[in-house]
Amino acid sequence: MKLTEEQVAQYKKDGFLIIRNFNTTEEIDIVRGEMKKLIDELDTPSTISIFTTSEQERKVDDYFLGSGDKIRYFFEKGSIEDGKLIVPKDMAFNKVGHALHDLNPKFEEFSYSQKIHDLIYSLGIYNKALSGIMYIFKNQKIGGEVDIHQDSTFLHTTPLTTHAIWFAFEDSTIENGCLRGLPGSHTEGITRRFITDPNSESGCSFIKLAEDKQYNKSDFVALECKKGDIILLDGSVVHYSEPNTSPNSRHAYTLHFIEGDNGVIYENDNWLQSAKPFRVL
């Protein structure tokens, strides 16, 4: 599915673009069913890694840092108490990452589809490499807030070439914590990077590139989606999501891609690394 000239212009203006009915219900149900199977078959791991974007609570462990070329499971903060699950297992996870697209055949077929190739190609990115793939649960009642951020802070290239496709696997509404984006914010660059840091107790740290900006949440646009819609996101666009306190989950899938050629450098101090080069779509 190729973007029209009008869609490309809108994306370049806002830094995000909603595309309706990109995936069929059947396509989504296949990979959602596969994720259910993976969760059902998973023994509760001895390593419990809780994922949060709160800088006050962010903890980076070896399990997380080693997930770039593996399938690993990260728990929601509100699902664990004294090292034990306090919610049903299928509601306990924040996300699964970061190599589903390469290690699971169902997700591989979904992620490397021709229509995704055509979509990215129409942006003028011809040699695209996939990285940082996540299945996001945002489960009912306990789905955590995702703080205001820019994806290129975490997946940095020189020059900046990171983009993301956010797939709505369920309806995404204001009530269950839809994405919210700040139009035009991608034109101002990024203010910091998240890097591996052997001198940091956690193994990672932020480095400042420019003065942090103060944002008013009322300036952000709610990017509500129906199941099957996608959101295209520039890696520099500022976005976030509220916690999900509703009775409805908000499953989604995020696929990041970068320019894989033309002298573009994927920084070797990015937190997400793979033993093999990122596979080109």
Curated annotation (Swiss-Prot):
Protein's recorded name: Phytanoyl-CoA dioxygenase domain-containing protein 1 homolog
Signal peptide limits: none
Obligatory cofactor(s): Fe cation
Organism: Dictyostelium discoideum (Social amoeba)
Keyword annotations: Dioxygenase, Iron, Metal-binding, Oxidoreductase
Binding site for Fe cation: 149, 151, 239
Reported function: Has alpha-ketoglutarate-dependent dioxygenase activity. Does not show detectable activity towards fatty acid CoA thioesters. Is not expected to be active with phytanoyl CoA.
Catalytic activity, EC: 1.-.-.-
Enzyme class: oxidoreductase
A single GO molecular function term of this UniProt record: metal ion binding
Family from the record: Belongs to the PhyH family. PHYHD1 subfamily.
InterPro entries per UniProt: Phytyl_CoA_dOase-like (IPR008775)
Transmembrane segments: none
Top-level division of the source organism's lineage: Eukaryota
Keyword Heme found: no
Chain sites annotated for binding 2-oxoglutarate: 95, 134, 149-151, 166, 241, 250
Gene behind the chain: phyhd1
Keyword Cell cycle: no
